[in-house]
Amino acid sequence: EVRRRMNELVHELEPQLPFSNEVVRYNVSAAGIFNEATVDQKEKLCGKIYPWKQTRLVGDSVAGFQAATLGKPGVLVICGTGTSIIAGNLDSEFTHRGGWGPLLDDVGSAYWIAVKAIRAAIDDFEGTGPKTAITSTLCEWYEIKNIQGIVPIIYHPEFNRAKFAILASRLDKALGNTDDVYQGICREAGTEVGKLTIHTVEKSGLDISPMPVFFSGGVLLFNRRAQKAFEETLRERFQVMLSQPRLPTVLGSTMLALREAGVEITDKLVDQLNSTYRNVDELTKG
């Protein structure tokens, strides 16, 4: 399906190019790839669609980094449904941590928070942990007699990681200001993401002060306790400059292609890309 859509995109784009113009760079980003794709990965996804020598396949976090930092040294921390951190040093070398997915524990992510919350409710029910309003809240939402009833719900194939992330968001709105146990889970999430960020920076050899740290994803954007703990953890180790990405993640591959084609990345170009993306986004939503 991915190959089919990519093929359609190329054939739709080429006739729209101004006369005598041609595509000189193809950049594709995909989940499940750490940094640069292997030859085998590139062949399976891009083979016979794009000119081989003009094509680059990278992980979606690499594209996200380009969109966030415009290719300059810095750190991108993505903490939403999953957690992924990438640091780019002065030599344009990348160090990537996280991004393993829910089964291998994306620490601090919305999925991680939801699982921790359910576990806290189980501990409350079994008497092995503190009392928490998480228990009664889950029972009310899922119309179950006690927390044991949540087992068939969360193990159902349709209860995917996105639904765990939605659950974390709902819990934050309901209990974020009132329940000590839930608040502790959120603080732990932010602290753990902060620690992983510090480790990533130290492994990358990036040495800039203040350290440019770009953050995105629902946990760091909307969960106030997680965000505060994340920032405090970072500031204990580095002088940091926190901000949101300069461009939407989806434009990261565009940034890579422009840079590799020798196009100068100016503020005017960045504003133009942002404007074009917003206009297209509004058209598709309309």
Report each predicted region and the residues it spans.
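Membrane helical hairpin/interfacial module
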Residues: L9, A30-I33
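Phosphate-binding/catalytic loop of phosphoryl-transfer enzymes
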Residues: F34-S136, N274, R278-G286
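Glycine-/small-residue-rich active-site loops that bind phosphorylated ligands and cofactors
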Residues: I33-N35, L221-F222
